[in-house]
């Protein structure tokens, strides 16, 4: 029997078990939940992406450079999003997921609104930390909920539809941000006459943050699905969810993590962790010497150290979950390959509005409108089509989802270069739209592949780790490094428009890493998926 035939046989057996389990809310309720969660994801990315269109206004008002803006958008958000995503992912695996999403939505919306009162770089950074913590609660829990409402056969398509909220939210955020700023300037040409002296960019944060708090009430009303129902692998409720999640929180808090490691593995575990801390410190000191931006490398270094500590703690306390993730070569390759694509999409996506303003002299409203519309429509088409194509061809090859990821660099690079180097404004927007169609086609493929490699009770944890990698590689490094190189070019005498153009061009090089990692994943995915239940049983997991 081939790997594909074995995979199909296992899937059919799971579906037979799943068909005997009555779904919460009836057969169509899952579609309703999906609709609500898409709206949550739209709010998620409005609050995250609006900083892009406000960047030039914030730079002018606070007197900061491209690297600092890249830090605010990327690292300041990403470190807290990624690190808190680990324990919040664990909480999603053992507690009520819709309650977790609702509480998180309230918190990040409040922190977005508070950004509207920021008076300096430090205030805004703290608010971005808070947005990152709140948003970390949503996607791992949503991935897990959706996977329990829909069959594995359509998982890439459904998760792609959910993930369309990324581009719908990003597009709406760009449009709203630009429209609010232009309107505010028209209403209050003298900022001192505005209510409470609020600047245009501050008003934009307030306008998009407050509605999310009301949305949280709607999310609270959703019904929780039966965990594992879609695959006939029902998982019983955890007897002490907050204790389990609390242990995971301890494992990511520096200082407390040493206590957690000692309790789990004794002095040897603590000594190993101290050695790891030293190695991480040396690595990031080297990066600081090469690119002396202290806050960036300290923050990212702490994030990487916390991740290493959590992986070690996971190995000691949940060896089955650790083994299903980190002993799977396909899982490791996928969680490098897809995030490398994210480096490009986050970097190009964030810097596109400032690029249009500098290189083409576009107004903030026009850049927000046309880039936002192109991102929303193009991204929605690309994400959904990517999931549909992957699920269709998966009936023919297990690697179909990976092939979608491998096709993206080949198809996206020409459109990215066209966007960066055409001198025709209309063509720039057309190239941006086409890039928005192609570049996100992998998103549903990545999420479904990660979920299919682990057991149902591990989905949110596995998703949290995948999102952590996606956040570190894509969000923390993409916008920052492009901003850093833009500043370097600018200081060498290149004007700001050309400096940003050159930096964004170099950013496309991350596609090379994605191709190498996904080719490696193609070698192992079929065997790792086929052996999922056997691997779990060998690790002591009840199946």
Which residues are covered by each model-predicted region?
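Extracytoplasmic gate region of multi-pass secondary transporters
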Residues: 51-52, 265-299, 329-376, 383, ...
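Central cavity-lining transmembrane alpha-helices of secondary-active solute carriers
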Residues: 72-90, 143, 373-386, 477
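Conserved MFS/SLC helix-loop-helix module at the cytosolic interface between two early adjacent transmembrane helices
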Residues: 83-122
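Cytoplasmic membrane-interface "Motif A"-like loop-to-helix N-cap segments
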Residues: 94-105, 391-408
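Helix-breaking motifs and short loop linkers at transmembrane-helix boundaries and internal kinks
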Residues: 63, 96, 117-123, 134, ...
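Extracellular/periplasmic helix-loop-helix junction of adjacent transmembrane segments
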Residues: 54-83
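C-terminal transmembrane helical hairpin of 12-TM major facilitator-type secondary transporters
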Residues: 398-446
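Helix-loop-helix hairpin linking two adjacent transmembrane segments in secondary transporters
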Residues: 166-227, 261-300
């Amino acid at each position: 029997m081939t790997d594909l035939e074995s995979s199909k046989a296992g899937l059919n057996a799971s579906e037979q078990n799943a068909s005997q389990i009555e779904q919460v809310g009836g057969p169509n309720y899952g579609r309703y939940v999906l609709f609500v969660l898409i709206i949550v994801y739209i709010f998620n990315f409005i609050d995250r992406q609006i900083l892009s269109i406000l960047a030039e206004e914030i730079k002018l008002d606070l007197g900061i450079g491209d690297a600092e803006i890249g830090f605010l958008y990327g690292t300041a958000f990403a470190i807290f999003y990624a690190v808190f995503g680990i324990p919040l992912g664990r909480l999603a695996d053992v507690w009520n997921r819709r309650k977790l999403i609702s509480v998180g939505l309230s918190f990040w919306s409040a922190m977005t609104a508070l950004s509207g009162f920021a008076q300096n770089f430090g205030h805004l950074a703290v608010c971005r930390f808070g947005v990152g913590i709140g948003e970390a609660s949503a996607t791992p829990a949503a991935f897990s909920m959706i996977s329990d409402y829909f069959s594995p056969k359509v998982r890439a398509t459904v998760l792609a539809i959910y993930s369309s909220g990324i581009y719908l939210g990003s597009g709406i955020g760009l449009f709203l941000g630009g429209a609010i700023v232009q309107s505010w300037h028209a209403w209050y040409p003298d900022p001192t006459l505005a209510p409470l002296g609020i600047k245009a960019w501050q008003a934009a944060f307030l306008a998009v943050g407050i509605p999310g708090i009301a949305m949280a009430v709607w999310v609270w009303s959703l019904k929780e699905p039966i965990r594992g129902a879609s695959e006939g692998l029902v998982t019983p409720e955890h007897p002490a969810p907050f204790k389990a999640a609390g242990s995971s929180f301890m494992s990511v808090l520096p200082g407390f993590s040493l206590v957690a490691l000692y309790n789990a593995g004794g002095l040897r575990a603590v000594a190993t962790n101290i050695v790891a801390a030293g190695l991480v410190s040396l690595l990031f000191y080297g990066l600081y010497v090469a690119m002396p931006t202290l806050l960036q490398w300290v923050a990212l270094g702490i994030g990487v150290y916390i991740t290493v500590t959590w992986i070690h703690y996971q190995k000691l306390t949940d060896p089955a979950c650790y083994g299903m993730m980190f002993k799977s070569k396909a899982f490791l390759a996928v969680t490098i390959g897809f995030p490398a694509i994210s480096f490009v999409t986050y970097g190009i996506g964030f810097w596109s509005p400032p690029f249009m303003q500098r290189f083409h002299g576009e107004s903030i409203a026009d850049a927000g409108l046309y880039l936002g519309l192109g991102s929303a429509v193009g991204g929605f088409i690309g994400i959904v089509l990517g999931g549909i194509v992957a699920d269709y061809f998966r009936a023919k090859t297990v690697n179909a989802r990976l092939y979608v990821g491998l096709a993206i660099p080949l198809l996206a690079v020409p459109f990215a270069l066209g966007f960066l180097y055409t001198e025709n404004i209309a063509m720039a927007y057309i190239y941006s739209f086409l890039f928005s169609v192609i570049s996100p086609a992998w998103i549903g493929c990545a999420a479904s592949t990660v979920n299919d490699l682990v057991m149902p009770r591990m989905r949110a944890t596995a998703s949290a780790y995948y999102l952590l990698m996606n956040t570190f590689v894509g969000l923390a490094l993409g916008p920052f490094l492009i901003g850093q190189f833009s500043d370097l070019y600018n200081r060498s005498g290149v004007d700001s428009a050309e400096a940003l153009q050159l930096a964004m061009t170099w950013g496309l090089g991350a596609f090379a890493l994605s191709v190498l990692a996904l080719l490696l994943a193609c070698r192992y995915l079929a065997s790792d998926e086929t052996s999922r239940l056997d691997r779990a049983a060998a690790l002591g997991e009840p199946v």
